[in-house]
Every structure is written in structure tokens, then in C-alpha cells.
A protein has these predicted regions:
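Conserved hydrophobic/aromatic packing and binding residues within compact polymer-binding modules
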Residues: 11, 25-26, 36-39, 65
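A detector for short, charged/polar N-terminal pre-domain segments
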Residues: 1-6, 73
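Short amphipathic helical patch at the helix-1/turn junction of helix-turn-helix
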Residues: 5, 16, 44-45
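Recognition helix of helix-turn-helix/homeodomain-like DNA-binding domains
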Residues: 30-45
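Short, charged recognition helix plus adjacent turn
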Residues: 56, 66-75
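Short basic helix-loop element that most often maps to the first helix and adjoining turn
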Residues: 9-28, 53
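DNA major-groove recognition helix of helix-turn-helix/homeodomain DNA-binding modules
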Residues: 49-64
Length: 75
């Protein structure tokens, strides 16, 4: 599975843990809701700035956001 898909699944998992809608995460992170949707579905390759905003919204570090995500394709 591609890293971008794994990252999207991780973001969805963290959002669901908090019982947040995509709109809730969008408001907390100042990221467009459609972008959040695309990100969760592996259709976006987010910038570091976007990832930092999302991690901050969840109250976690950037490294925690990537837990369980393979960062090297093909492994």
C-alpha cells in the first residue's frame, strides 16, 4: 500500500477516535474540508505545513502522525 494511502487512513483513524467529522478537523486545522477528504482517500500529497496543522489539531507530534505509515514505497 502506498504511503499516501496509509497516511490518509491514519488521519481518518485519528479523526474518528475523537469523533470528529471532516468539517471538525478542517476547522481545527484550518485546512479545507475537501482537502481533508482527498487526503483521507489518498488523492493528495500534503505539504509539511498541512501535516503540521493536522498534527497540531490532534494535539500530537508530526512523528506521531506518521506512526504505522511506511515511508519507503515498496517495503
Amino acid at each position: 500500500m502506498k504511503a499516501v494511502m496509509q497516511l490518509g487512513m491514519r488521519i481518518r483513524y485519528l479523526r474518528n477516535l475523537r469523533k470528529w467529522s471532516q468539517e471538525d478537523l478542517a476547522l481545527e486545522s484550518n485546512v479545507n474540508r475537501n482537502y481533508i477528504c482527498d487526503l483521507e482517500n489518498g488523492r493528495r500529497n500534503p505539504s509539511l505545513e498541512i501535516l503540521e496543522r493536522i498534527a497540531d489539531a490532534f494535539g500530537i507530534s508530526l512523528s506521531e502522525l506518521f506512526l504505522g505509515v511506511e515511508t519507503i514505497e515498496g517495503l
